């Protein structure tokens, strides 16, 4: 059986010398797939994503990307390997224009990135319209599109999003999810942490429900939405 494109396998660890937050947690994503991590507050969702990105030290387990063990690489080196990461907050330069923000995303590129910029504008048409506007003047949903677009400028092999719909209205959330689906259709696998579990699972090829840093449930998005225990405990019935 072929290994998933990305796998954080049996990850155990926490921040610095503190207690473990993750306990044998496994997260995997295939090419072109949307995988979401959901669960209650304090479940370790964002911690699991940060572990995959190298922002905390694992005591046990490993992270492999496209068959390579990247467990000992820094976040910067993981970006060079093909990881794109969009944090939940402070993810744009508010005083720069939209286009300047996107061009900042190409900082590791040594080639002509104009074609990639056009692809980002095709995925996020509102950014083309507002490309000369200061990013700080945009709405919350538009700022998130800038942040995702900037990550795409690195031509990542994998895109990770930490609560991309935090603080936006339901209508904007639906639009962001539509854009995320469009990104996945280009072949880029997406790993996403979401508080809006029901909506996230509805677009997910694969879902992971974490509880206290452990895998509680996993399966396709549809399977988890139809699981009575998941619905009762995490989706409000």
Residue ranges and their predicted role:
Residues 2-237:
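Glycine-rich phosphate-binding loops of nucleotide-dependent enzymes
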